Design a protein with these regions (language model features):
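Catalytic cores of the polymerase beta-like nucleotidyltransferase superfamily
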Residues: 1-442
Length: 442
């Protein structure tokens, strides 16, 4: 049980049947979606189905269980009240809202009024039907006010519960979330939603930079984030997420050293594809370094630093990304084509300087080789330690099994004896290894 599940169990246990909150607390949004997908919670969003219920509930919890619940914290802009719950020395943020509907001016941007509403009205204003699901904390019953949230979730379809243009204009970050869900969860985006995103990308100028940065970081953790970046380019969203980078990615000039006359973006896309497919857990710093590597090589690190800072990425993180691009450029300068031209000690000192980052740097070099001509590819295998290296996969198809049936014991008793003998030998080898380790440690 992770910290989110423990927190929900705690809240469920302390709200008894005689409490006014009993039966009125719902898990909502991503919590319910992820649970139905068989995934673990990544955050906790609660809804209290009563007027001003979110404030009353959080204030009650912080007063009655002050040893566990710290707060309350009020976020007037989003109509949210939150608290920190401490269980087993782990801190979990719990955000709470009431069902509400927002009244906007004719521009669909200016918020005029927020009022309490029914669950059906609350569901109609959410971003996608698969996120408009409500699970009662005490009964466990899942409500689907739109009537299609569960079926859309099963079919992997992203569609807004009402007019997508209105939904996106009221909160432009929902467009970016749609792209992220498409690649993070493997969903399909409804054609009407895709068209609405393309037609209303300019509204992203009204979004808070921090929210855009958070969505970008989440997108980078998906296996197909390279295609996600391509979608951001196609829809016009990338110019708001990372201002200044689009002009480099849309440059039609062939990339120097690229295979078959590919452009800068085509090479970057191939490199990102390798990182996402083969090394999805690579630190996002290395993924961002891969994203801007070609720009740094052609236009310098100063321009890349400005692009990253304009995207709201912190200075410390930007410094780490630029350091990685500098390391890659230094490594590339050690070679003239396939020939190593630097003094021998330079490579040794360079490898030692990488320390714990050696694996990540090796993966980066390997990814950057993708789409380059063979004569300009860099030897990424140099970063394996002695005795290490990629092991060939053991093929187990029928073509590599003994062709003769005589090689298999036909006698069941003989087969059983062979099995017991092999088990005994494995145990003997295991005990021998254990004795060697004990001897070395003593």
């Amino acid at each position: 049980m992770n910290k989110f599940e423990k927190t929900l169990h705690f809240i469920k246990d302390v709200i008894h049947e005689d409490s006014p909150f009993y039966g009125q607390i719902y898990l909502v949004g991503g919590c319910v979606r992820d649970e139905l997908l068989g995934e673990r919670y990544s955050d906790i969003d609660l809804l209290v189905n009563m007027p001003n219920g979110q404030k009353a509930f959080i204030e009650y919890m912080c007063a009655e269980h002050a040893d566990r619940c710290k707060g309350p914290f009020y976020y007037q802009r989003y109509g949210t009240t939150a608290m920190d719950v401490i269980i087993d020395d782990s801190l979990t943020l719990v955000e709470c809202v009431e069902p509400h509907i927002e009244e906007y001016a004719d521009d669909d941007i200016t918020l005029l009024e927020t009022r309490f509403c029914s669950l059906e009205e609350d569901a109609s204003r959410r971003d996608y039907t698969c996120n408009a699901l409500y699970k009662n904390l005490h009964t466990g019953k899942v409500l689907d006010p739109t009537g299609r949230g569960i079926s859309d979730l099963k079919n992997g379809l992203l569609i807004t519960p009402s007019d997508p243009v209105t939904i996106y204009r009221q909160d432009p970050v929902r467009m970016l979330r749609g792209i992220r869900f498409k690649h993070q969860k493997g969903f399909r985006l409804d054609p009407a939603c895709w068209k609405a995103i393309c037609d209303n990308a300019d509204y992203m100028a009204n979004a808070a930079p921090k929210r855009l940065r958070d969505e970008l970081n989440k997108l980078l953790k998906s296996r197909t984030f390279c295609d996600g970046i391509q979608d951001l380019i196609t829809t016009g969203l990338l110019q708001y997420v990372m201002p200044g980078i689009v002009e480099h990615f849309t440059n039609p000039m062939p990339f120097e050293g690229g295979e078959g006359g590919i452009t800068l973006w085509e090479h970057t896309h191939r490199a990102l594809s390798v990182q996402g497919r083969e090394h999805p857990r690579t630190d996002t710093i290395y993924k961002l370094a891969c994203l801007v590597m070609d720009i740094a090589l052609l236009n310098g690190r100063d321009e890349v630093g400005q692009i990253l800072l304009n995207a709201g990425i912190g200075r410390e993180k930007v410094g780490s990304i630029l350091h990685i691009t500098e390391l890659y450029e230094r490594f590339r300068n050690m070679f003239d084509g396939e020939e190593y031209v630097a003094p021998p000690r330079v490579l040794v000192r360079f490898q030692n300087s990488l320390s714990k980052s050696r694996d990540n740097f090796r993966r980066l070099v390997r990814a950057e080789n993708t789409g380059l001509l063979p004569e300009v590819q860099l030897p990424w295998r140099l970063f394996y330690d002695d005795g290490e290296g990629p092991q060939p996969r053991q093929r187990r198809d029928h073509d590599h099994r003994p062709a003769s049936p005589a090689s298999f014991p036909s006698d069941p008793e003989a087969s059983s004896r062979n099995h017991k003998r092999n088990v005994k030998r494995r145990e003997q080898r295991k005990r021998a290894r254990s004795r060697r380790r004990n001897t070395e440690s003593s």
